[in-house]
Amino acid sequence: MATAHDLRRIALTLDGTTEAPHFDRAAFKVARIYVTLAADGQTANFKLTPDEQELKCLTAPDAFAPVGNAWGKQGWTTATLAALSGPELARALELAWRHALPKPRAHQKKPVET
């Protein structure tokens, strides 16, 4: 059974992660937010792809559900922390964290030499 303390502890070990308030939630982000923790510590919303969301919801319907608005259609997924094991929480956090990493700049302009 995972807890809010577990989420915070694991998230802050992921490279570049910071914690900041986000409305009534705690947000964990690198370049972008990848997970938010509810104020009551019972649930968290993870940044997943729609395909990852579908898989999580099919394999663990007691733990995962789409966020109930337009964000859910983009893959944002609510997890009930008490329904997750520690390793399941760690896998979900790492998956979401990877989606929030800065994108490489493929076409960076070089300075003009004069």
Task: Locate the predicted segments by residue.
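Charge-dense, helix-prone N-terminal extensions
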Residues: 1-114
